[in-house]
Design a protein with these regions (language model features):
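Amphipathic terminal alpha-helices
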Residues: 2-4
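Short, highly charged low-complexity linear segments
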Residues: 6-14, 110-117, 152-159
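Extended, small-residue-rich solenoid/repeat segments and analogous flexible loops
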Residues: 6-63
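Hydrophobic transmembrane signal anchors and adjacent membrane-proximal interface regions, especially
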Residues: 11-15, 43, 92, 131, ...
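Generic structural signal for short, solvent-exposed loop/turn connectors between secondary structure elements
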Residues: 38-51, 78-87, 185
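Secondary-structure boundary/capping motif
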Residues: 49-50, 70-71, 128-129, 136, ...
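Flexible, glycine/small-residue-enriched loop-and-beta-strand segment within the central core
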Residues: 56-69, 74-144, 170-171, 177-184
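C-terminal/domain-terminus segments
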Residues: 142-168, 172, 181-185
Length: 185
């Protein structure tokens, strides 16, 4: 089995120079404890399939306590999930990504103040596997994000995103296919 080497012919690793493997192991244990405490104290209703990395600053809330997370999901600091959501395996959220409700307040009731209006219908958001979401992206509830998609920083996603595409903008539009000329698997 061959291993890639760096410029100085040493095997490449994810360990930063000057950082010991023991320090990384201790940090990994501390992260696992922090994650378990997060779900125990703040988000018992969330269903998890496997490893999740979640900073304390992330807010998970759902009108029907219906959030499920796949294996290897990582949230950046300040992310917000305020809708029912199903998130697949191997999904990366950058900082301050928001999944927000679509009909949190009914605005179509004459004579009823928005403050007093009941909640509208709830829409579940689906994020496929192997998805990368950039800094400060916003998703309106009810969208489906296909497997392998990349959402650029600052995007506002109001429509479904096809698999293996890169989208960006406000509203988000397809920028390109991830694997031009290849059949994605």
């Amino acid at each position: 089995m061959s291993q890639e080497t760096g410029n100085d012919n040493r095997p490449q690793t994810n360990v930063r120079p000057g950082r010991s493997r023991a320090a990384l192991a201790i940090r990994a244990i501390a992260n696992r404890i922090r994650t378990e405490l997060y779900f125990l104290l703040r988000a018992r209703f969330v269903k998890r399939k496997g490893m999740v990395r979640i900073p304390w600053s992330v807010e998970l809330w759902s009108p029907h306590n219906d959030i499920s997370l796949g294996d290897r999901v990582q949230f950046g600091p300040g992310c917000i999930v305020n809708c029912d959501a199903q998130i697949g395996d191997s999904v990366l959220f950058a900082r301050n990504v928001a999944l927000v409700g679509r009909d949190d307040h009914r605005i179509d009731l004459p004579g009823v103040l928005i403050w007093d209006a009941p909640r509208g219908d709830s829409h579940k958001t689906f994020i496929g596997r192997d998805v990368w979401i950039g800094h400060v992206a916003i998703f309106v509830a009810g969208v489906h994000i296909g497997d392998g998609a990349v959402v650029a920083a600052g995007s506002v996603v109001v429509k479904d995103v096809p698999p293996y595409t890169v989208v960006g903008g406000n509203p988000a539009k397809v920028i390109k296919k991830r694997f031009e000329g290849l059949s994605a698997q």
